[in-house]
């Protein structure tokens, strides 16, 4: 978790750092999608009432990824409350998904310090509350729900374990 506190949009070295980080992430894989697109696609069908509706929502979001260019998601310790249960709704009243994963790149290199979180509702809620000025720099990667029950525990930094679940 120490690496997660090393970079935060509030303390980053200004626009030059953000632009350089975006360039370094140009070849990131899988693709990332802008936070606002992520939110609008996810909530386009309203609340999820069943597993099938959740899968449909993820499918819609997966479609939204097509054609999106990758840039990094900046997430500092302030927004890494942990991989545990959080509120069931955004502050605006929209439902929060329970099976969407977020990957946060906290260094200029997209291949370093990835933070995979299952049931990361606290983090998703924090992203929703970020100032609008940050939204152009906030992108997310979407993961499938893990079939391995162990991967639903506390984050241990094991990116490779979840790699097969990346869309």
UniProtKB/Swiss-Prot annotation:
Superkingdom of source: Eukaryota
Region (Disordered): 148-167
This protein's name: Putative uncharacterized protein FLJ41423
């Amino acid at each position: 978790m120490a690496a997660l506190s090393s970079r935060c949009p509030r303390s980053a070295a200004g626009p030059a750092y953000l632009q350089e980080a975006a360039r370094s992430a140009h070849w990131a894989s899988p693709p990332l999608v802008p936070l606002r697109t992520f939110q609008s696609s996810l909530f386009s069908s309203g609340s999820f009432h069943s597993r099938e509706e959740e899968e449909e929502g993820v499918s819609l979001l997966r479609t939204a990824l097509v054609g999106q260019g990758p840039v990094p998601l900046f997430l500092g310790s302030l927004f890494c409350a942990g991989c545990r249960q959080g509120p069931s709704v955004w502050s605006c009243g929209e439902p929060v998904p329970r099976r969407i994963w977020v990957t946060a790149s906290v260094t200029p290199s997209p291949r370093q310090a990835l933070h995979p979180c299952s049931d990361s509702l606290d983090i998703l809620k924090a992203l929703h509350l970020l100032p609008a000025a940050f939204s152009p720099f906030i992108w997310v990667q979407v993961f499938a729900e893990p079939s391995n029950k162990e991967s639903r525990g506390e984050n241990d930094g094991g990116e490779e374990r979840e790699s097969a679940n990346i869309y």
